Amino acid sequence: MTGLAGRTALVTGTAHGIGAAIADMLETEGATVHRVDKDTLDVTDGRAVETYVSRVGGVDVLVNNAGGVCGQTGRPLEEVSEDDWRTVVDANLTSTFLCTRAVTPGMKERGWGRIVNISSGAGRSVSLTGIQAYASAKAGQIGLTRQTAHELGPFGITVNCIAPGFVLSNPTTQRQWESYGEDGQAALVGGIAVRRLGAPEDIANGVRFFVAEASSWVTGQTLSIDGGHAIF
């Protein structure tokens, strides 16, 4: 398929899993894809992000996928340090703001743009991780999606969001899954309408919908892709 032929895309958090699947999908759609991860670009550093986008020469499609729990585990609120909080919020929410800010001038100039933020079911309900900063940052991404969609819509730019359910996509989610044990795993799958965990390609397919020309009248939305978990 060549629906994005001639377009340039930037995807953050592409080392594996969801980000890699999204980048692969965009390439099959004909886009020139720039893949970045923490080893190639610090997306919490505004100057570095601006420099990277300038060097790329313009971004038509931005997928803010970078983030995660940053090696943290759920702890009582009183045991969470300010540094712990900032690390997770910066990785998930601040990075989304910085990357969006960097690509906006070029999108405005060209009169076209697609921005998709990868949030989480943790941004819409209680997080399975138990990490307060993660739940807060993911909810913040949803709010940022609405606000920027309202601001950028007149310039031909749509901004949407995906809230994935439990996707086995990286070593962290694999460890989390294994920690549940057989009973916990059965309970989790039993709470998913289609009775299976998500795959990275499920999320990539949601991004495919949002970046398509046919979705030009869809903006400010958050799509839960969770196998029906949110309906329980």
Predicted regions and their residues:
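Catalytic loop of short-chain dehydrogenase/reductase
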Residues: 68-69, 116-140, 145-154, 166
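Substrate-binding pocket helix/loop in short-chain dehydrogenase/reductase
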Residues: 73-77, 81-89, 184, 188
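Short C-terminal tail/terminal secondary-structure segment
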Residues: 125, 207-208, 219-232
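A glycine/serine/threonine-rich, flexible loop-to-helix segment
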Residues: 166-191
